[in-house]
């Protein structure tokens, strides 16, 4: 048996997994206190701010692309819908896995199914994430059925596919916005630059923009590493829609700050103001400015760079809401422990590995890796023989 070639990135991957395995052992057998720098003043850290808030946001490409293709009939984007679906499905599985580390008693998570509190935003988020992950699994089944040539179950799942797409869009819309609603109960704790009654709306708009940015990012990375061609017209089209969503987000965000008379906080010499401008600069100000030039918005390589900026900016946004905006009230500066970071990196590394294996062995892209033979073979072409040769 031939051993895999040792490369730099494979070595990094193994080291991340080993550190994550050790941190997982410490977390399970010694508890949250030994693994994290969380406290009563800072009960939510990187596992909530990044793994949950950012993880759910970064997985938004699934509902964005599936809505475009199957609801708004933008069939030209169908070749990149499956990679977006795979990213969404993996993203939610990893979000659930990461949540288990943050819960003091993870086995109690099942109680959300039986102990209902309809007035709780967290109850709604829990149910929506659970149901949406189930819907994503059902939407992903046709890919598995195609790979193993299971014609009958494939026909059955396709009959209910439209219902699944509609359910997925509704559920994703609900909990993407509800993650913002979680912070509406802390008006005196969250910094004015981030606290607003419009937080659920801003979370949803940014999720749509990030879904498009993630699709551009993953399409570019997949083309580079898996050797298939990059669909330039599709990437350019996604870039134009992303520009529109970023403009909408930027207008709503800045208008909200101005209307609530808190914009002056952005110009004070504070740590919060610095983080706000980093978030705004990377998230929408610089991307909008760059994409106003045709040579940027019509070039896939430059759109890839813009998508990295957008992703970085909105990841900062979620971390600012979860951590930076709370530090002024708590009086503590939260710096995650290395074991927290190693577990987060391990979750991300496992996700990248599973994505790579799925692309290799399943029909994710319209051509190339993992593509099975057609379920119905085309007829053999007939050879025409001239009458004079008979």
Q: Predicted regions: what is each one?
A:
Residues 5, 298-390:
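TerminUS-proximal long segments
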Residues 13-34, 97-103, 170-181, 355, ...:
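Alpha-helical transmembrane segments of multi-pass membrane proteins
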Residues 25-42, 71-74:
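Membrane-interface helix-loop junction between the first two transmembrane segments
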Residues 42-107:
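Membrane helical hairpin/interfacial module
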Residues 86-106, 126-137, 314, 318-321:
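C-terminal halves and exits of single transmembrane alpha-helices
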């Amino acid at each position: 048996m031939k051993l895999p070639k040792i490369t730099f990135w494979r070595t990094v991957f193994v080291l991340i997994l080993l550190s994550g395995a050790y941190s997982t052992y410490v977390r399970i057998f010694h508890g949250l206190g030994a693994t994290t720098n969380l406290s009563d003043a800072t009960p939510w850290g990187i596992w909530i701010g990044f793994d949950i808030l950012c993880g759910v946001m970064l997985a938004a490409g699934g509902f964005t692309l599936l809505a475009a293709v199957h609801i708004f009939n933008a069939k030209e984007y169908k070749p990149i819908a499956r990679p977006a679906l795979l990213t969404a499905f993996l993203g939610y599985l990893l979000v659930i896995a990461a949540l288990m580390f943050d819960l003091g008693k993870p086995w109690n998570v099942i109680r959300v199914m039986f102990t209902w509190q309809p007035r709780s935003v967290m109850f709604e988020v829990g149910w929506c994430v659970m149901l949406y992950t189930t819907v994503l699994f059902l939407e992903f089944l046709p890919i598995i059925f195609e790979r193993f040539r299971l014609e009958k179950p494939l026909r059955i799942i396709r009959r209910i596919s439209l219902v699944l797409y509609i359910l997925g869009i509704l559920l994703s819309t609900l909990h993407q916005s509800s993650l913002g609603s979680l912070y509406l109960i802390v008006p005196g704790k969250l910094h004015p630059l981030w606290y607003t009654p419009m937080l659920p709306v801003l979370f949803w708009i940014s999720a749509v923009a990030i879904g498009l940015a993630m699709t551009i990012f993953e399409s570019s990375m997949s083309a580079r590493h898996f050797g298939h061609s990059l669909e330039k017209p599709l990437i350019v089209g996604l870039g134009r829609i992303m520009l529109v969503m970023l403009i909408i987000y930027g207008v709503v965000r800045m208008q909200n700050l101005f209307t609530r008379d808190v914009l002056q906080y952005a110009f004070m010499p504070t740590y919060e103001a610095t983080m706000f401008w980093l978030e705004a600069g990377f998230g929408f100000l610089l991307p909008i400015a760059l994409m106003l030039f045709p040579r940027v918005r019509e070039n896939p390589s430059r759109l890839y760079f813009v998508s990295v900026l957008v992703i970085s900016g909105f990841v900062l946004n979620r971390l600012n809401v979860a951590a930076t905006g709370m530090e002024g009230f708590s009086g503590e500066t939260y710096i995650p422990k290395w074991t927290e970071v190693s577990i987060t990196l391990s979750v991300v590394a496992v996700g990248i590995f599973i994505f790579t294996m799925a692309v290799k062995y399943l029909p994710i892209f319209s051509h190339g890796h993992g593509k099975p033979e057609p379920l119905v073979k085309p007829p053999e072409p007939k050879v025409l023989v001239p009458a004079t040769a008979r």
